[in-house]
Amino acid sequence: MATAPRPRTSTREPEELGRRLGAWLDGRLPGAKVTNVSVPGSNGMSSETLLFDIEHPDTPLRACALRLAADPAAYTVFPTYDMPRQHRVMGLVAAYTDLPVPRVQWLEEDPGPLGAPFFVMARAEGRVPPDVMPYTYEGNWLHAATDAERGALQEASISLLARLHDQFPAGEAEFLLPEGEGSPLRRHVAAQRAYYAWVVGGLAPSPLIERAFARLEELWPADEGPAVLNWGDARIGNVVYDGFTPVAVLDWEMAAYAPREVDLGWSVYLHRFFQDLTVSFGQPGLPDFLRREDLERRYAELTGHTPRDMEFHTLYAALRHAIVMLRIAYRQAHFGEVEVPADPDGLILHHASLAAMVQGTYW
């Protein structure tokens, strides 16, 4: 999940996790040693990642990454972390599509060994567009690339989304449908309303977020379109690249059964979030990169499906991101890193953009 300046992310110590991981692994691969344990600098604020190597003559994996459900003591971003669900999604995507998804190896549902459920997968080698500071800022490899190189990365990245939506059998994703009544999109939005209610439980609600939900109803698509497997957190910050070629598609915890445009709207808006933030700090950013019109046009060319109701779907993406940002801000306050202002809308970094979307003046 994309964020602003990085707050505290965990109460766990990598060395202790490595020791406990070694004890757990010995039960599956007797005599195996866990070495080179580290936490990536881009470790997220939802599930955590631990990198390590396995030394054993018969190990199925040597360079590994472990995804561990969030530590409840760290004031979690989401109310639940379903590691078996993520593990299942990644295995299915690998089975049904040609997307470069890391091989998933072991799933541990018992929280005993490491304090929370986790799974182990192959570690991908390469580089990831940074979130902090965002790739739209000066001083990173993607910003320093040529227009042609960024164009190649953009083309390869939108192709990932197109291939996922086209190749994955939609019926195999129905297990991701939230409980309740109504269409997949109705259920998806209802789940976000429930998440928002959880975020503000006992705390100040956000008038802006509530206006955005009301605006969604006004813009609701007349034809929602068929549901497909959505990646969920569909953005280039969750892709490992070799040069400018994708070699691993990561972070499937937000995977969903929803219309194609839910993924596409997220991809469009999450880039705009970084671009707007960069411009607000006096830098030009990357104004010709990942533009909405270019992504929509190319997606239509690749899939034969013309994206529709994108005002709705980009607003929905900005709204969903706002709920996460509000939770992260309340989380920072919990750790004593920020003060909570009288107006909670001020805690949402992109409140001006979201307000413009609600008013219909952003695009």
Question: Which residues are covered by each model-predicted region?
Answer:
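Juxta-kinase regulatory segment immediately upstream of eukaryotic protein kinase catalytic domains
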Residues: 2-34
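ATP-binding pocket architecture of kinase catalytic cores
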Residues: 38-209, 219-224
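Conserved protein kinase catalytic-loop anchor
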Residues: 227-229, 247
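Catalytic-loop of the protein kinase fold
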Residues: 229-231, 236
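Catalytic activation segment of kinase domains across protein kinase-like and atypical kinase folds
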Residues: 240-266
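Active-site activation/catalytic loop segments of kinase-like enzymes and analogous catalytic loops
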Residues: 262-303, 317-335
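Helical subdomain adjoining the active site within ATP-dependent kinase catalytic cores
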Residues: 305, 309, 320-363
